[in-house]
C-alpha cells in the first residue's frame, strides 16, 4: 500500500495569496507543495498526489466579482495550478496527479439546498453557487488537461440526478446540505459516506 502524507489545509486556495484580511487563514497549494518538498515527503518515490482547490478562492475579499472578471480568475487559476502541478511532477516524476472535483451543490438549477432533515429539503435561490461551481469545475478540468493529470469530475457523479448530493433524500448521500441529518463533519461538505466514495474513486483512478 501507499503511505499517506497529508499537507492539505482547511481553507487552502489555488491562487489567492494569504493576506491579513482573509476570511479564513489559509495557504496555497503551491505553498503546500513546497513544504512537502522541503520535508522530503514529495520525491521520486511518491506514487500518487491528490489536489482539490478552487472553491476557497471565490470568497476571498480581493477576489470578489466586483473586483475581478471570470477570465481573470480563470487565467490566475490556470497559472497557479499548472505551476504547482508541474512543480510536483518535476520532483515526483513517477507520481500520478489527480485533481479532485467538487460535488454538485445545487438542485440542478439555481437553487442550493440549505437544509435536508427528515427527508425534507429546502431549496434556496442562490445562483452564485451554480455560477462559481461551473467556474471551478472548468478551472480544474483545464488545469488537469494542461498538465496531463487526471480529473475526477464529481459534479457529474454526485448530483441530484444521481440521488447522492445534499439535495437528495438518500440517507446514504455523499454531500451534506448546510443543515443536514446525515453523518458528516462539516456543513455543506462531504458526508462520511461521501469521503468513502472519494477514497474508492481515487483508488480506482490510481489503478
Annotated model-derived regions:
Residues 3, 94-96:
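Residues at the starts of beta-strands that form the adenosine-phosphate
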Residues 105-207:
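Catalytic His-Asp segment of secreted/periplasmic serine-dependent ester chemistry enzymes
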